[in-house]
UniProtKB/Swiss-Prot annotation:
Activity regulation, short description: Inhibited by N-ethylmaleimide. Redox-regulated during autophagy since reducing conditions activate ATG4A whereas an oxidizing environment such as the presence of H(2)O(2) inhibits its activity. The cysteine protease activity compounds is inhibited by styrylquinoline compounds 4-28 and LV-320.
Pfam families: ATG4_LIR, Peptidase_C54
The keyword rRNA-binding appears for this protein: no
Modified residues (N-acetylmethionine): M1
GO molecular function per UniProt: cysteine-type endopeptidase activity; protein-phosphatidylethanolamide deconjugating activity
Modified residues (S-nitrosocysteine): C189, C292, C301
Protein name: Cysteine protease ATG4B
Domain text: The LIR motif (LC3-interacting region) is required for the interaction with ATG8 family proteins MAP1LC3A, MAP1LC3B, MAP1LC3C and GABARAPL1. Required for proteolytic activation and delipidation of ATG8 proteins.
UniProt motif LIR: location: 388-391
Species this protein is from: Bos taurus (Bovine)
Disulfide-bonded cysteines: C292-C361
Subcellular location: Cytoplasm; Cytoplasm, Cytosol; Cytoplasmic vesicle, Autophagosome; Endoplasmic reticulum
Annotated InterPro entries: ATG4_LIR (IPR046793), Papain-like_cys_pep_sf (IPR038765), Peptidase_C54 (IPR005078), Peptidase_C54_cat (IPR046792)
E.C. designation(s): 3.4.22.-
Length: 393
């Protein structure tokens, strides 16, 4: 059966392959497990991640648009999953676990409501699709990892409850000074609309070099998304070690990407296989609920997750990290610096203190798709025209 036409009712969970009996550790978003002694703990961790899949019969996007995202929304759903993990870490903590038919904290309900399939949910398929129009994507068009990262960054501005600082690193470069400035800023962190068009260049929505007067503002929790291309047609095997190490970091949010025909949300690895949640299941939309509890069983994957060889991964991906505090960010920087010492491993991105003079401010390049730079970046990172195929209905 084609993955695009699977429905929740036709799934048989016994058909999903269980974890292999191996002495190799299983890593799930910064947590290490033994499949020989902790299989239940592994599955509980996986089931606690929010699982967003294709849905049908939701209110029409834009009032007259699609009522289902089957066949085109897989990367949007993966973007929802990686961002939902950031909100779970922000409001519930990495060690929170979901239990079926058990009342959850109100903050869990608020996180879930932010992703429901309705126009007034901050990170709904409706909001992502309509915000994507401003990025040059028509509703129903397939997204690549970079585009969905840019859209989520813009939507996060409206999520005042979470108050996240979202940084999308470009040109394979993470600039520490830019991130510290962003996380210490109380100004809008996406879009230059808050400033006059003829003002100085802006980084992440505030003037370059602007630190603000007086005492430093409190650190805002950071969501760091890094679009990458790890090869031309295939992933360069030299990146495998550093990619796997990303899942071992406690700040890990996982990876969005996939392989020809589909996009997945990768949450860990075992041996040379990546572990992922698959959005290619069509479920009925959950009726909008303004109060807790939200019917939530279909938002949690209650069967063993998928696995695929790293060699099968499409080279166009986006890696995510969450740093609740500045100490978390400093620790992440130290870990990344140590990656360069791994024998035979190729760094996936560069970590620098200051913006290199030959690079433009990364967020300026994404304020408008009229910019030739933005178009260049989208062609480089979003390989939907060549490496991905839209699933046929």
């Amino acid at each position: 059966m084609d993955a695009a036409t699977l429905t929740y009712d036709t799934l048989r969970f016994a058909e999903f392959e269980d974890f292999p009996e191996t002495s190799e550790p299983v890593w799930i978003l910064g947590r290490k497990y033994s499949v020989l002694t902790e299989k239940d703990e592994i599955l509980a961790d996986v089931a606690s991640r929010l699982w967003f899949t294709y849905r049908k019969n939701f209110p029409a996007i834009g009032g007259t648009g699609p009522t289902s995202d089957t066949g085109w929304g897989c990367m949007l759903r993966c973007g929802q999953m990686i961002f939902a993990q950031a909100l779970v870490c922000r409001h519930l903590g990495r060690d929170w676990r979901w239990t079926q038919r058990k009342r959850q904290p109100d903050s869990y309900c608020s996180v879930l409501q932010a992703f429901l399939d309705r126009k007034d949910s901050c990170y709904s398929i409706h909001q992502i699709a309509q915000m994507g129009v401003g990025e040059g994507k028509s509703i129903g068009q397939w997204y690549g990892p970079n585009t969905v990262a840019q859209v989520l960054k813009k939507l996060a501005v409206f999520d005042t409850w979470s108050a996240l600082a979202v940084h999308v690193a470009m040109d394979n470069t993470v600039v520490m000074a830019d991130i510290r400035r962003l996380c210490r800023s109380s100004l809008p962190c996406a879009g230059a609309e808050a400033f006059p068009a003829d003002s100085e260049r802006h980084c992440n929505g505030f003037p370059a070099g602007a630190e603000g007067g007086g005492r430093a503002a409190p650190w805002r929790p950071l969501v760091l998304l890094i679009p990458l291309r790890l090869g031309l047609a295939d992933v360069n095997a030299a990146y495998a070690g550093t990619l796997k190490h990303c899942f071992r970091m406690p700040q890990s949010l996982g990876v969005i990407g996939g392989k020809p025909n589909s996009a997945h949300y990768f949450i860990g690895y075992v041996g040379e296989e990546l572990i992922y949640l698959d959005p290619h299941t069509t479920q009925p939309a959950v009726a909008a609920a303004d109060r807790c509890p939200v019917p939530d069983e279909s938002f949690h994957c209650q069967h063993p997750p998928g696995r695929m060889s790293i060699a099968e991964l499409d080279p166009s991906i986006a890696v995510g990290f969450f740093c609740e505090t500045e100490d978390d960010f400093n620790d992440w920087c130290q870990q990344v610096s140590k990656l360069s010492l791994l024998g035979g491993a190729l760094p996936m991105f560069e970590l620098v203190e200051q913006q290199p003079s030959h690079l433009a401010c990364p967020d300026v390049l994404n304020l408008s798709l009229d910019s030739s730079d933005a178009e260049r970046l989208e062609r480089f990172f979003d390989s939907e025209d060549e490496d991905f195929e839209i699933l046929s209905l």
